[in-house]
């Protein structure tokens, strides 16, 4: 059995998965911007137009939160840098994503206030907020376990598998939240144009394939 050859093949597959993830991730950002800026009213948190405020939510929850979380996961496993640099970039990208996610969630609540809608009544909102809170807990857990100098190497070794599995599970929960959010928004729009409907479908597929590619990259990245 050629272990060296197997490792080389897995490293190549990991690099390919990372490139594919970047492609679908950036494609989803572009499609999101086309949708919100061309077909919808635009993006503005402080606008008097409630629909512009609402558009901040999907923009920041994907482009600012989910996309950065995926990048953070791949950075830790696939970036060619020292382990300490990988950890700092991993934690930093997660933190930026969480901050932008808070703004995105506030935009949804702000929209509800403007149009007198109740908060937290949809499956999307339940999945989304649960995922966001758990990811915040995951970040705090990781900071105290893997970045704090007083944490022992034994503790880090024991906790690492759970941290990795939790991160991968939360990535998929975030993908589910994004897709249910797109479905909910499409339902709100009613009879939109065929071109817009197709764009939303392609956006959902790009987000899904981004998440799958990130997971493949992370799963194979341990062989780098």
From Swiss-Prot:
Q: Name one GO molecular function term.
A: metal ion binding
| Annotated membrane topology | Multi-pass membrane protein
Chief localization: membrane
Presence of the UniProt keyword Transmembrane helix in the record: yes
Q: What is its EC number?
A: 7.2.1.3
What is the enzyme's main class? translocase
Q: Can you tell me which residues bind heme b 1?
A: 57, 124
Record-linked SMART domains? B561
Would you name any one GO CC term? membrane
Membrane-spanning parts? 19-39, 53-73, 89-109, 127-147, 162-182, 199-219
- Describe the location of the Cytochrome b561 domain by residue ranges: 20-219
Cofactor: record remark:
Binds 2 heme b groups non-covalently.
Tell me its cofactors.
heme b
Q: Name the InterPro entries on file.
A: CYB561/CYBRD1-like, Cyt_b561/ferric_Rdtase_TM
Annotated function: Two-heme-containing cytochrome. May catalyze ascorbate-dependent trans-membrane ferric-chelate reduction.
**Record note on quaternary structure:** Homodimer.
Name this polypeptide is given? Probable transmembrane ascorbate ferrireductase 3
What is the species listed in this Swiss-Prot or TrEMBL entry? Arabidopsis thaliana
Name of the gene encoding the protein in the UniProt record: CYB561C
